[in-house]
Amino acid sequence: KNGMSVIGFDMYNPPHTMGSSHGKARVIRKSYSEGSHFVPLLNRSYELFFELQDQTNLEIIKIIGGLMIAKKGANSLEGIKHSSEVHNCEIEVLTSNDIRSRWKIFNPEEEMEGVLDLMGGAVFPENVINTNLNFSKGYGAELHFNTKISKWISDDNYVTLKTETGDTYYGDKLIICSGAWLPNLLKDLKLPIFIERQVLFWFDPINNSEIFLPENSPNHSWEYEDGKMIYIQPNFGDGIKAAIHHEGYEVDPDKLDRKKIHQDDEKKLRSII
């Protein structure tokens, strides 16, 4: 689009299920609890998602709000408030009574507080990826799927890429977005990166299914212990998504059995919920 010559590589055929870029709906939030320095990146991301949605007939992003619930004064709540103050993000600070009266599915304890990010919502990753791939091809990008990069070298002149099949490519700049394979491609930099197993669940509500729909429930996260939380996304058609934030063990992405769910995975999540 900007007149550059671009080549893209993926070791699988996108959109695929080998990264964090699938699952029909993914959480997006603007007033970031982990640091206000992320907000400018998020502002630009929102712009691009809405622009993509305007250019297509596909649902790319949906704003439903994002609610964080924790004990008053928790770092997770204060981080959201700080990001809001620095970057003028739209939030609401809610008491436990406010939360109970607004949403039927919540029953927080009295010492808990909520912060609602009004721009929280969902991004629909398969639509995003397919649309961006189609647009990039239309602008002249060269895309190589099922192609694994085995090595890259950067010097004063250019970047060299080598594929597992022995092909070599040269360029001026390199952007690496390899997800769980990032430590392998950046091992010479000795960065403190490790891959953690994450398990997500989708539940079908037995009763009162309407209260779990996006129009009746925001994305929500609960800090059930200091620094430990679960996050839940309403039903966008495949069920209610729920997961524990982090707390997984370190894995090798090439050796991980992605189809195996341990009995304790679901048991722990259900006990927290």
Listing of model-derived features with the role each one plays in the protein:
Residues T17-A25, F106-N107, H246:
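Short, flexible, mixed-charge acidic loops at enzyme active sites
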Residues N2-S21:
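Glycine-rich FAD pyrophosphate-binding loop
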Residues K71-F145, K151-N157, K162:
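Flavin (FAD/FMN) cofactor-binding and adjacent substrate-gating region
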Residues N2-S5, N57-K62, T168, K173, ...:
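Active-site substrate-recognition segment that forms the wall
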Residues V123-S209:
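Predominantly flavin-linked oxidoreductase catalytic cores and closely associated redox partners
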Residues A25-R102, M112, I230:
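Dinucleotide-binding Rossmann-like beta1-alpha1 core, especially the glycine-rich loop
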Residues E51-I61, S83-E90, Y139-E142, D155, ...:
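Surface-exposed helix-capping loop/turn segments at secondary-structure junctions
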Residues H22-S33, G248-L256:
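Short glycine/proline- and charge-enriched loop/turn segments
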